């Protein structure tokens, strides 16, 4: 059987032949049963030694050198290989990602000032505590009771969802959950039981969460240039005059009757 080594150390020489010679060579290379192969049936190849054998030989030489070396030399060689591997891996490793810039901590909002008692003030005076002046506390009233809501400036301060209630007695608006300007008043007449219950819940929430700092002073409404107090006083004076007039009339009638009685025999 014809055999040939798989690899050769030197490249093979390719010879181009004429067509006729190629046909003769092909015909002579066809194997027929009962016909012996030319050249003894052996195909020779002048290939050199396989490169794999050289590698195996080098490994064997290194192994023999390691066996003959002293333990100190072996340990030193292993340590050197480890150092080389460490250095090589560090050089080939991808660079670390750039450090992210350190974010400066945001400035925290200063805590709200301590509640200050304002005492008894009018509704007009309460308007100046609607949050437009940051130096003043943020106040709001329910049923005439004033509370300091400065700690909830995000809700009741300028731009907040309930900023419309700040600086006012918003009892009716809270009871009806209304944002209409005509409901921003302390007048709770005509409210339903459900609305009064909602207002009571709001009052409980405010009294338990916020500090009460004052009350709203009741101002009598003027009508026709005279206040209600003047009207009451005038009514009292008129009443006293009527009583006095009635007494005088009764006295005159009594005196007339006495005179008539004295003329009779």
Swiss-Prot record:
Protein name: Membrane steroid-binding protein 2
Free-text note on domains in this protein's UniProt record: The cytochrome b5 heme-binding domain lacks the conserved iron-binding His residues at positions 155 and 179.
Region called Steroid-binding, residue ranges: 120-217
UniProt key word Flavoprotein: no
Keyword Secreted found: no
Record lineage: Eukaryota, Viridiplantae, Streptophyta, Embryophyta, Tracheophyta
SMART domains associated with the record: Cyt-b5
Transmembrane segments: 63-85
Similarity comment: Belongs to the cytochrome b5 family. MAPR subfamily.
Domain Cytochrome b5 heme-binding: start-end pairs: 118-217
InterPro entries (UniProt xref): Cyt_B5-like_heme/steroid-bd, Cyt_B5-like_heme/steroid_sf, MAPR/NEUFC/NENF-like
Localization in the cell: Cell membrane
């Amino acid at each position: 059987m014809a055999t040939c080594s798989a690899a050769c150390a030197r490249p093979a020489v390719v010879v181009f032949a004429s067509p006729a010679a190629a046909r003769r060579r092909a015909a002579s290379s066809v194997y027929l049963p009962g016909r012996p192969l030319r050249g003894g049936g052996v195909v020779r190849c002048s290939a050199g030694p396989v490169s794999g054998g050289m590698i195996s030989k080098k490994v064997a030489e290194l192994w023999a050198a390691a066996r003959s070396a002293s333990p100190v030399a072996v340990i030193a060689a292993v340590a050197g290989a480890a150092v080389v591997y460490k250095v090589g891996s560090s050089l080939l490793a991808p660079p670390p990602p750039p450090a992210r810039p350190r974010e400066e901590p945001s400035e925290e909002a200063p805590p709200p000032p301590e509640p200050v008692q304002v005492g008894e003030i009018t509704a007009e005076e309460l308007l100046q505590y609607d949050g437009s002046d940051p130096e003043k506390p943020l106040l709001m009233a329910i049923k005439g009771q004033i509370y300091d809501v400065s700690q909830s400036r995000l809700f009741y301060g300028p731009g907040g969802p309930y900023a419309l209630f700040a600086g006012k007695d918003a009892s009716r608006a809270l009871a009806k959950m209304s944002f209409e300007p005509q409901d921003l008043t302390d007048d709770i007449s005509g409210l339903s039981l459900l609305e009064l219950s909602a207002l009571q819940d709001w009052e409980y929430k405010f009294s338990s969460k916020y500090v009460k700092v004052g009350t709203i002073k009741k101002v009598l409404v003027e009508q026709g240039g005279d206040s209600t107090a003047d009207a009451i006083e005038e009514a009292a004076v008129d009443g006293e005059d009527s009583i006095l007039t009635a007494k005088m009339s009764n006295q005159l009638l009594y005196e007339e009757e006495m005179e008539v009685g004295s003329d009779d025999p």
